[in-house]
Design a protein with these regions (language model features):
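Short coil/turn connectors at secondary-structure junctions
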Residues: 2-4, 73-76, 103-106, 130-136, ...
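Conserved catalytic cysteine-centered active-site region
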Residues: 33-37, 42-50, 84-135, 141
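Short glycine-rich or small-residue beta-strand-to-loop segments that form or flank ligand, phosphate
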Residues: 76-84, 110, 245
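Condensing-enzyme catalytic core mediating Claisen C-C bond formation in acyl metabolism
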Residues: 1-50, 156-228
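Flexible, glycine-rich active-site loops centered on histidine and acidic residues
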Residues: 130-172
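Phosphate/pyrophosphate-binding loops at sites that engage ATP/ADP/AMP, CoA/4′-phosphopantetheine
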Residues: 32, 59-76, 223-243
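Active-site-adjacent elements of ketosynthase-type condensing enzymes
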Residues: 87-95, 123, 131, 143-154, ...
């Protein structure tokens, strides 16, 4: 049995419309220098007929269309990864699976977690591909949602800077034992998690949070996850081991 798994193919869909970040920040009466530091010039905007499902399908369709019927039938798992879910019970993977015309001999489910769900889905798919020899399709898809008042004033001033830097997009990854794009190292990982109230979205169109707390939590998790990684993987070096950083 192969001990290799990872990303066989990958595709991105960023929508068909965008806004100029500088113009948007000026309209919201924000300091443009903050967005210059982020090296941003444009942000995608979902059109009224677009949602996380349509974004996900557009990301995955070129990958699936390039596969032979036999290869498509080897996809035994479709995972959607999002924090923009459209249903409390039904997974978006069911819609994406149907629109892509994939075999019904397939597992369909969704992972919800801010920022981490795409990575979690990829790791889950890689483990499945490693154990079964089948392929898995991972679709990370999100639409940023911001509610703003008229006259350029954001309803939530603390989060008004997030609007110009948040957009919409989807990435589809075909995961298998033929990792032409990226090979994952099985068993090499670091764990560190805890609850922190840095962000909260209790209803679909409203969000609250603490950006400073979020940043500090990320740094804390990065440091301690690396320590756990180093305890599992011999000879690891932060500067030399991770070629893609």
């Amino acid at each position: 049995m192969s001990r290799l798994s990872g990303i066989e193919a990958i595709n991105f869909y960023g929508g068909s419309a965008y806004l100029d970040v500088e113009e948007l920040a000026r309209h919201r009466q924000l300091d443009n220098s903050r967005f210059e530091n982020l090296l941003m010039s444009q942000r995608s905007v979902p059109l009224p007929y677009e949602d996380p499902v349509s974004y996900g399908v557009n990301a995955a369709e070129p990958i699936v269309s390039a596969m032979s019927p036999r290869e498509r039938d080897s996809i035994e798992m479709v995972i959607t990864c999002t924090e923009s879910g459209i249903d409390f019970g039904k997974s978006m993977s069911t819609y994406i699976h149907e629109m892509l015309g994939l075999s019904r001999r397939c597992r369909l489910f969704e992972v919800k977690n801010a920022c981490f769900s795409g990575t979690a889905g990829l790791m889950m798919a890689a483990s499945y591909a490693l154990s079964s020899g089948a392929k898995a399709l991972v679709v990370a898809t999100d639409l940023a949602r911001f509610t703003a008042a008229d006259a350029g004033e954001a309803l939530q001033s603390d989060w008004s800077f997030a609007e110009p830097s948040g957009g919409a997009g989807a990435i589809a990854m075909l995961v298998s034992q033929q990792p032409h794009v990226l090979r994952l190292d099985p068993g090499a990982y670091g764990l560190y998690s805890y609850e922190v109230m840095d962000t909260c979205r209790p209803v679909p169109d409203s969000e609250a949070g603490d950006a400073d707390l979020s940043l500090l939590s990320y740094l804390d998790c990065c440091e301690n996850a690396y320590r756990d990684y180093a305890s599992r993987v011999a000879g690891v070096d932060y500067q030399g081991t991770f070629d893609y950083l």
